[in-house]
């Protein structure tokens, strides 16, 4: 059975039940297709990208980070990666995805961006 890593990026502002439903639906889909869902990586976007879409938003990255941790902490195979939220570690989504994909593919997993 081939391992698969699922990748979700987005604002998650705010995170809600349909985000979780989407994750579970994708996990179920790939499990049904015969894959072992090794992990699901959730990556909230940098706040700057949200400011382009919405006007008048307050910067609430700490609040959003707490929401994600509280909402997803019970699920062992869901990993939250905050690197794109943080200006110091933000290398850009395209490079971030490419680096993750190279890492998991080189270790024998299939990497799927949802």
Map each language-model feature to its residues.
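Nucleotidyltransferase catalytic core that binds NTPs
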Residues: 1-114
């Amino acid at each position: 059975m081939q391992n698969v890593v699922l990748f979700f990026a987005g604002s998650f502002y705010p995170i809600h039940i349909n985000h979780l439903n989407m994750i579970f639906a994708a996990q179920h889909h790939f499990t049904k297709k015969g894959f072992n869902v090794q992990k699901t990586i959730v990556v909230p976007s940098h706040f700057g990208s949200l400011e382009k879409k919405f006007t008048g938003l307050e910067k609430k990255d700490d609040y959003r980070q707490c929401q994600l941790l509280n909402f997803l902490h019970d699920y062992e195979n869901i990993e939250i990666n905050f690197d794109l939220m943080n200006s110091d570690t933000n290398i850009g989504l395209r490079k971030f995805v490419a680096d993750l994909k190279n890492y998991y593919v080189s270790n024998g997993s299939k990497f799927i961006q949802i």
